[in-house]
Amino acid sequence: MMTTTDLFLLNATNVAQTQLSGLEPWLNALQRQQWQQIKQPRRRQEFLVSRAVLNRLLTSHLGQDPQNLHFYTGPHGKPALTGPGQEHCHFNLSHSGDWLVIAIGDQGPLGVDLELGRRARSPLPLAQRFFAAAEYQYLADLPQAEQNSAFYRLWSRKEAVLKAHGGGIAAGLDKVEFVPQQKWCLLNHLDGVDYRVHDWPWQGGWLSLAGRTSDVHLHQLDECLEIMTGQPHLDKNP
């Protein structure tokens, strides 16, 4: 088993047409049925790319044939693998804007979240409603120009933990609290697990990963779905 977690970043709208035409065979029967039911072209391409690339990456990671991948969906909607020799492999994916991110690793449940949104209005009312009181106060004390980025950084970190837990946002954003003034220390009121949370500025937003490992490798796929050499060009961390 691998002791690292790999993150794969891809612009799902920038995949070459020659690659798109060859992705359908990578879908399993259920995925193909779901894909065929999608009418909106952008959403249809996004679904095809995300599921086909996920299956390709899992096949490579496990060293198994794609038809042997067996998925199930947890009680709160989180997908996982259940086939022979696959239970140790954990994965998670997230979309935002044009971008897709897939996390794969063997060291326990993973949660990944990508937030590229920009709010025209102040994020403080949302933070007051969904965040812990101390987090709201942290945002309120920041200069107005910094509040938007800090809000999405908090949201991304929180959602990554909630996805690793498996309950998603319904489990409660306020149950996962961060203390930015203490190196973004996690106060986990949800399940007590000591998740290791990493984040990176990406495309003007934030990418966060929650899991059990501190060794994370980032990769970017090009329009031909090949891994690009070198590290992805991350934004400067504010």
Where do the language-model regions lie?
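Core catalytic alpha/beta fold that binds nucleotide/phospho-ligands
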Residues: M1-P238
